[in-house]
Amino acid sequence: MEIKRDVYLQQLIERKDNGMIKVITGIRRCGKSFLLFTIFKRYLLENGIDVDHIIEIALDGIENEELRDPKVCFKYIKDAMKDDGKYYLLLDEVQFMPRFEEVLNSLLRMSNIDVYVTGSNSKFLSSDIVTEFRGRGDEIRIYPLSFAEFYSVYDGDYDDAWDDYMIYGGLPQIVSFQSERQKADYLKNIFANVYLRDVIERNKIQSVDEIGILVDVLASAIGVPTNPSKIANTFASERQMSYTNKTISNHIDYLADAFLISKASRYDIKGRKYIGANMKYYFTDLGLRNARLNFRQQEPTHIMENIVYNELLIRGYNVDVGVVDIFDKDKEGKRVRKQLEVDFVVNQGNQRYYIQVAYDMTSEEKQTQEFNSLRNIPDSFKKIVIVNGSKKPWRNDEGFVIMGMKYFLLNANSLEF
């Protein structure tokens, strides 16, 4: 069973032969290698590229350990280029090679090679794309399966697929398992023995217990504004552990560098500026988040919000958390300042959308809560409320678009309604 990753294949096709290093980044086990070595390679072969002109190197395999030496690897690539024809280099997990940017820069100076690399750590990739390749690095971010991709190969109906996706996430391997036990064991094992171990070893972390607990704290607080100071207080009061703000901040950065979590900044909509140190943190894959918590804390509201956030990133949007300041009267009739939250401020080019995510909108109180933030935004960009279920999109009397989660997830252009 093959999962089509057409969105990413199209991005590779559009960048083919553009004279830049194509750097495919994303969390480990999200399908980067399959995209490159199977899907994209097949595209090259089907479009007339000779197999001898495709050079494949997987640096995470023990069989290629010697190629982690940059000089040995460069010589291997040069020796594989037997003529002046165009060659395509597919280089997997490039962060295993020290000074890899020197090898790639040398390849950039050769006119007859088109280079594609993958990597699983942004610290060694995203910053280097800018600084080392001098504008000739082109990053393509890959994510775990979107719900639409997951559903396309799921053996069951929408409701069952949605329940499974909320619990076990979208790592491609998950769809091959039949039992819940297999899925749970797989996620727990790779979180401890792949993801967390990678972070600890790569960053030479001594405080192993602390970063493990930090992951638990972040997993318990998806979609909740927080900062290192608040987390340090949690460690002190609930765990009787000393964990400095700076160390917490560094460890959060390490988790983000490994693509395990994403940070959403808070944006003052009226003031048009970013504010404060509080961030919201979301997990790149909810199955990993849930496995870390031993599949407890299944809060559908925050899980749904996390899924919407990830889907927006997959579609190429920039996503922030919105804040709207208003003045209101308290119980004593005094005029007080209040801060209302908009779940997501979504930007792409000159397009902007304001999005609220609501698991349940049946009560009048909940409707007021979700709509009030949108009512106080002083511009005419589209305002959307995504609710749980299969509701088709419609506009209410105030012009807000209300749509069900199913419509949002299964229609790539759903925000254009």
Where would I find each of the regions flagged by the language model?
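Interdomain hinge/linker elements that couple catalytic modules in large macromolecular machines
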Residues: 2, 148-325, 337
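A cross-kingdom feature that marks ATP-driven nucleic-acid transaction machinery
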Residues: 2, 25, 34, 45, ...
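Pre-Walker A adenine-sensing motif
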Residues: 2-19
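Walker A/P-loop nucleotide-binding motif
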Residues: 19-37
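Short glycine-rich substrate-engagement loop in P-loop NTPases that contacts/grips substrate
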Residues: 55-85
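Conserved P-loop NTPase "ATPase switch" module shared by AAA+ and STAND
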Residues: 82-100
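Structural recognition of the conserved hydrophobic beta-strand(s) that form the central parallel beta-sheet
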Residues: 114-120, 141
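Short regulatory helix/loop adjacent to the ATP-binding pocket of P-loop NTPases
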Residues: 123-138, 153-155
